[in-house]
Amino acid sequence: MAAAKKRTQSDIEDVRDRKAKVIKDSGEKRHIAALILARGGSKGIPLKNIKVLAGVPLIGWVLRAAVDSKQFDSVWVSTDHDDIEKVAKTWGAQVHRRSPEVSKDSSSSLDTIQEFARLNPEVDVICHIQATSPCLHPFHLKEALEMITKQGFTSVFSVVRRHHFRWQEVKKGGSVATQPLNLDPCNRPRRQDWDGELCENGSFYIYTRATIERGLQGGKWAYYEMLPEYSVDIDVDIDWPVAEQRVLRFGYFGLDKPEVVRLLLCNVSGCLTDGRVLISVSGEEMVSVNTRDTMGIRMLQREGVEVILISSSEDLLTKALADNLSQRTGCEVRQLGKDIQGEVIAMMDDKDLDWKEVAYMGNDAPDVDCLNLAGLSAVPRDAPVVAINAAKYSCHSAAGLGAVREFSEHILLLKKKAKSQMEQDRIHRNTF
């Protein structure tokens, strides 16, 4: 009787697989969803999924890659935490608010993904992307999804090639000798003479609905190999600085090329200064400016980026103070009215610039529109949440304490990265 029941279940699975094949062969469009699991109760690093990595919330890196890949009919973040939900929506994702039953420490990824599938019956293919994969690029997702949509696989997962010699674990203090698991110690191969082993790197797992209903992997499965530079593990605090350096070099920074930035607009109050205005006994107004920040401005100017300091009607600067700042920084200082966005657009029109050519540094609610529209944007560490959510980069430094220098270095790093890529593309074109 048990055998008959097993055959019946197998028959059901075969029917599902044949149905998926019919859809593929007929060219019928299947709904493909990206799903990032981001529970609030991370044990290794508290709220790790929205901790800022290289100026971007961790889940922002994979959400940017998923959205820009243009492969998904919907992009989702599954969470049980209000702050993660806010960040997810800011980065263009829909939110699956998971139930308490799948939000426990003991809950598995499969439990959550199956709940998501039940609540979204229109979804045919789920691409489960790990939030801890900040070096993921759109082309990785596109190529892996084609293995499902064009090659007929029902389960695809990412791997990386490792060249690690593994040994059997034995009890400490015991007399049992360890044994090699994947090598002959008498004939140790050189790295270049050994193909290594394929290991899951956890970047993503893609499954058809039929597959996910019976497990995370199954059916006709395949691996998608990623290069080591794109494979990053973030589990404990010590991984964070390593991942930050890796993502600055190999991360995906978006569709717009950062080298086109021609102009930086930077707020004086709350960015270049700490927001305080000191008044002398004679009534003279003074502000404190960090020399690191003024050096950052000069670094940009030397690279051909114009820097204009701006002040809103709510933070008026005296003419003497504005002149002093202009002289010290070598920048024009402009006083803007209440319509900051409108005046910035007029300024861009005068200079024949587009938003992607503008970097904007703000610090509060009036700056949100410009922070959203600018090709690059940033806020100091101590900016309010409304501004942080709108900015593309969140500084580690506070206002008046190096935030402008940090953002300047970020702009220059992206320009250098883009210039290097352009040079590499030129070499490839000339060679081939």
From Swiss-Prot:
GO terms for biological process: N-acetylneuraminate metabolic process. Belongs to the CMP-NeuNAc synthase family. Homotetramer; the active enzyme is formed by a dimer of dimers. Expressed in testis, ovary and liver. GO terms for molecular function: keto-deoxynonulosonic acid (KDN) cytidylyltransferase activity; N-acylneuraminate cytidylyltransferase activity; N-glycolylneuraminic acid (Neu5Gc) cytidylyltransferase activity. Substrate binds at R39, N49, R98, S107, S109, Q130. The keyword Magnesium does not apply. Coiled coil: none annotated. One of its GO terms (cellular component) is nucleus. The lineage of its organism: Eukaryota, Metazoa, Chordata, Craniata, Vertebrata. It is found in: Nucleus. It comes from Oncorhynchus mykiss (Rainbow trout). Its main location: nucleus. This is N-acylneuraminate cytidylyltransferase. It catalyses: an N-acylneuraminate + CTP = a CMP-N-acyl-beta-neuraminate + diphosphate. SUPFAM superfamilies: HAD-like, Nucleotide-diphospho-sugar transferases. InterPro entries: CMP-NeuNAc_synthase (IPR050793), Cytidylyl_trans (IPR003329), HAD-like_sf (IPR036412), HAD_sf (IPR023214), Nucleotide-diphossugar_trans (IPR029044). It holds the Pfam family CTP_transf_3. Keywords: Nucleotidyltransferase, Nucleus, Transferase. Its EC number is 2.7.7.43. The active site is at R188. Catalyzes the activation of N-acetylneuraminic acid (NeuNAc) to cytidine 5'-monophosphate N-acetylneuraminic acid (CMP-NeuNAc), a substrate required for the addition of sialic acid. It is an enzyme of class 2 (transferase).
